[in-house]
């Protein structure tokens, strides 16, 4: 018993003597249930901290086009790749989770990637909708500007935070509809992700356990609209559907996939002429989770395995590197105030052009 107490005290002292660890816990409001949990979390933090420092040293020497930083994910996952099942462009999982300062996180404590993946609730969802010929209309071969940023046109709402809920698909869907609604009406309305989380199960979505942007669009079309965020605020959990027709913020007629699939030139024409586009990406890499700024170039990122839905709001070039400007749903304390510049014209890196989709209003 005395030995156990002595060991526990040594662990507590060791973690307390790490100023970076103590600062990390303070900044992100981290709380742990036990000393053993804190020791494991501290180990993961140290691994990620070494990875970030090593990468940034190489980036400073010009070996990488982006930098990383420690953030709210740094005590949850290791540097190793997640395991994800192979999925096709017409059948993909788009879910991920986020962590906010001060949240009680003891119930999602993972020491291995397998435990983490199970905790995220990853699953394969099967499409139920029949393909409409209109979905696959080829993008017209038109000339577009070299640089596009729909934020400057007023077509993009503020960065949001999905919290402890695998609802990135809902944020991606609302983002593209917000843009199309603005371009048609001139009014930017923040739409309700919670409406989609709670009410689109019959279409095939799984709320906080994952979903599809296309099925979100089908729900909105069949439902006759989607509520505003103000009227139906986000709760980051599955709740009973309480859609209110008097709070309708936008609607749509159909949706279309950017075709040909996997074609970055087609996606560029879509983003350049249509507006913000919902896209699916591989976000499993530790480098993505710890992204800070610069053009994210990760050769190991899969072009065919997707687990995260985001919003392409523009594109351009920086210091000779082409990029996609992407809005994430992990809050403004991640990346470039919630955004990331992802490599463009790098063989469809991270699968960004594999299954892009947008609503028709």
Annotated model-derived regions:
Residues 2-361:
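Catalytic-core signature of thiol
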């Amino acid at each position: 018993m005395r030995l156990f107490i002595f060991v526990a005290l040594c662990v507590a002292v060791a973690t307390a003597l790490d100023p970076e660890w103590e600062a990390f816990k303070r900044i992100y409001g981290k709380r742990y249930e036990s000393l053993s949990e804190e020791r494991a979390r501290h180990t993961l933090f140290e691994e990620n901290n070494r990875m970030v420092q090593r990468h940034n040293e190489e980036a400073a020497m010009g070996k990488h086009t982006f930098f990383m930083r420690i953030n709210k994910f740094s005590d949850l996952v290791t540097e190793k790749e997640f395991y994800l099942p192979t999925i096709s462009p017409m059948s993909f999982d788009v879910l991920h989770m986020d962590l906010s300062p001060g949240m009680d996180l003891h119930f999602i404590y993972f020491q291995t990637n397998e435990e983490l993946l199970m905790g995220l609730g990853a699953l394969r969802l099967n499409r139920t909708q029949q393909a409409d010929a209109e979905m696959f209309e080829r993008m017209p071969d038109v000339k577009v500007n070299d640089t596009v940023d729909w934020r400057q046109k007023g077509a993009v709402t503020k960065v949001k935070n999905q919290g402890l809920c695998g609802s990135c698909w809902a944020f991606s869907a609302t983002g593209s509809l917000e843009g199309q609604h603005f371009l048609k009406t001139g009014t930017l309305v923040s739409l309700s992700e919670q409406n989609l989380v709670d009410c689109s199960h019959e279409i095939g979505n799984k709320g906080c356990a994952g979903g599809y942007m296309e099925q979100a669009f089908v729900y909105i079309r069949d439902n006759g609209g989607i509520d505003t965020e103000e009227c139906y605020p986000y709760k980051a959990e599955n709740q009973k559907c309480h859609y209110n027709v008097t709070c309708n913020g936008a609607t749509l007629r159909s949706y279309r996939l950017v075709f040909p699939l996997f074609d970055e030139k087609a996606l560029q024409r879509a983003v350049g002429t249509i507006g913000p586009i919902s896209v699916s990406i591989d976000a499993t890499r530790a480098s993505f989770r710890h992204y800070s700024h610069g053009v994210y170039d990760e050769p190991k990122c899969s072009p065919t395995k997707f687990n995260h839905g985001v919003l392409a709001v523009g594109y351009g070039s920086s210091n000779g590197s082409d990029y996609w400007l992407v809005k994430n749903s992990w809050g403004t304390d991640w990346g470039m105030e919630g955004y990331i510049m992802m490599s463009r014209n790098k063989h469809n890196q991270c699968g960004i052009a594999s299954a892009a989709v947008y609503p028709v209003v």
